[in-house]
């Protein structure tokens, strides 16, 4: 590109202390991305796949932010669109993004019609020993009493920068569940934002990550409660080691009129090593009295009693750390319905973390 694109990403809904420089991130992008279409496999007849420019794409706000839309505009392709056409829960789709070296942008739109369920699994892979970047934006709309389940694993090479974005809207009694494993990419900008518009709608996010080898993770997750008796849960579980860094922003926003709403945000971090950067901003915004919001974070090294227990069974400290770290990843990975995808995660993690030899 002749002029680099200056992007503001992962911006908090409300600024905190500016001197911390954690309210948002600024990225200079000087590439011209190529449109990348996923390979799509659909099981069952309750879903259709098309490619098109999506009307109303801009009306759904995403976690990484509107500046990321510009990469899709530069690439100029048509979004993959998945829509339900029946009321079956057995139908699911697997989308694979297998990148060579280079710079790419992709968009995916999910639409679950009234009383239907849409199940989608996404695999981001490739880029091993190659430099590049990938921008993947997913936006979802769940009509009344519809449910969307998204399972995403990011297994990119360490020389890749990944922009992994999500935005969703739920109508009355609708629900969105987002499960993500962020294991690759040297630099990751990930986020999600969901608007719970309808009464008794819900959102759940279960995010796992393992950052090492100088990886940098920058994340922003927001849920906005509009409707009465809406519920949300965001669970973030991760491991930091080998000079890695992580910035996580988690916001629960109770808007006027959402009486009876409940929101929970939890973060659990295992820190293996001393040269690490761990930053967290848990934020609760409230314009309504009759609501319940909770957030909590636990972080630190393995407890001495755990290490003692494992060492008494002949497991050295380094192996014990690998066992406990793997258990956190497995807890998220086990939520993914496709065995073949779970095996891809196991292969990516490698045999060095296998615990069979020590038990």
Each language-model region and where it sits:
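Small-residue helix-packing motif on alpha-helices
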Residues: 201, 320-321
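Long, low-complexity, mixed-charge
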Residues: 1-77
């Amino acid at each position: 590109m002749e002029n680099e694109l200056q992007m503001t990403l992962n911006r908090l809904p409300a600024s905190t202390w500016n001197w911390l420089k954690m309210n948002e991130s600024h990225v200079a992008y000087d590439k011209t991305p190529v449109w990348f279409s996923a390979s799509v496999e659909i099981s069952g007849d309750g879903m259709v796949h098309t490619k098109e420019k999506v009307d109303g794409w801009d009306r759904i706000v995403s976690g990484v932010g509107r500046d990321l839309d510009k990469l899709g505009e530069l690439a100029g392709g048509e979004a993959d669109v998945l829509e339900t056409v029946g009321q079956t829960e057995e139908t699911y789709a697997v989308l694979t993004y297998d990148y060579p070296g280079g710079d790419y942008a992709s968009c995916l739109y999910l639409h679950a019609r009234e009383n239907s369920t849409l199940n989608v699994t996404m695999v981001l892979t490739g880029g091993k020993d190659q430099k590049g970047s990938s921008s993947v934006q997913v936006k979802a709309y769940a009509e009344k009493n519809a449910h969307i389940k998204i399972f995403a694993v990011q297994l990119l090479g360490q020389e890749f920068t990944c922009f992994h974005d999500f935005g969703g809207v739920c109508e009355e009694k609708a629900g969105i569940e987002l499960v993500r494993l962020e294991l690759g990419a040297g630099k990751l900008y990930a986020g999600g934002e969901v608007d719970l518009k309808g009464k008794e709608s819900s959102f759940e996010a279960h995010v796992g990550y393992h950052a090492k080898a100088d990886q940098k993770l920058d994340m922003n997750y927001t849920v906005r409660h509009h409707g009465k008796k809406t519920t949300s849960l965001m669970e973030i579980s991760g491991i930091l080691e080998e000079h890695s860094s992580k910035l996580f922003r988690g916001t629960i926003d109770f808007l006027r009129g959402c009486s009876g709403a409940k929101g929970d945000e939890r973060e659990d971090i295992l820190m293996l090593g001393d040269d690490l950067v761990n930053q967290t901003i848990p934020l609760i915004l409230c314009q309504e009295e009759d609501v319940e919001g909770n957030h909590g974070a636990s972080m630190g090294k393995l407890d001495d009693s755990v290490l003692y227990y494992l060492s008494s069974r002949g497991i050295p400290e380094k192996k014990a750390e690998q066992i406990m770290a793997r258990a956190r990843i497995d807890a998220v990975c086990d939520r993914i319905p496709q065995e073949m995808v779970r095996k891809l995660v196991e292969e990516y993690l490698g045999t060095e973390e296998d615990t069979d030899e020590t038990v």
